[in-house]
UniProtKB/Swiss-Prot annotation:
Belongs to the histone H3 family. The lineage of its organism: Eukaryota, Sar, Alveolata, Ciliophora, Intramacronucleata. Disulfide bonds: none annotated. This is Histone H3-2. It comes from the Eukaryota. The gene is H3-2. Its main location: nucleus. Core component of nucleosome. Nucleosomes wrap and compact DNA into chromatin, limiting DNA accessibility to the cellular machineries which require DNA as a template. Histones thereby play a central role in transcription regulation, DNA repair, DNA replication and chromosomal stability. DNA accessibility is regulated via a complex set of post-translational modifications of histones, also called histone code, and nucleosome remodeling. Residues 1-17 have a biased composition (Basic residues). Residues 1-32 are annotated as: Disordered. It is found in: Nucleus; Chromosome. It holds the Pfam family Histone. The keyword DNA-binding applies.
Length: 114
């Protein structure tokens, strides 16, 4: 006995175990997944750079007409008026979510709730 470490024998066994597991599943590779929060942060950066409207135009227009019909029937809207309402609504909602997020961070929370 020379006092050196004995060669490790279980490494080859682990390799065989790994390859047999891959062969058993048919070698199907799992689809790539980002860590939780990564995609959310990427979307936040993307939407903060952009200036386009985030709510689809036609559903918003239907909502405006539905609300207006409660006050008066047969109202007509210029397309620019609906667009102005949508711009104002989205600006308000963005500001509301910013304030909500600050309040959540202040309360040491991550999730915002209604």
């Amino acid at each position: 006995n020379t006092g050196g470490k004995a060669p490790r024998k279980h490494i080859a066994h682990k390799q065989a175990k790994k390859s047999s597991a891959a062969a058993a599943t048919g070698g199907v590779k799992k689809p790539h997944r980002f860590r939780p929060g990564t995609v959310a942060l990427r979307e936040i950066r993307r939407f903060q750079k952009s200036t386009e409207l985030l709510i689809r135009k036609l559903p918003f227009q239907r909502l405006v007409r539905e609300i207006a019909s409660e006050f008066k029937n047969d109202l007509r809207f210029q397309s620019s008026a609906v667009l102005a309402l949508q711009e104002a609504s989205e600006a308000y909602l963005v500001g509301l979510f910013e304030d909500t997020n600050l309040a959540a961070i202040h309360a040491k929370r991550v999730t915002i709730m209604p």
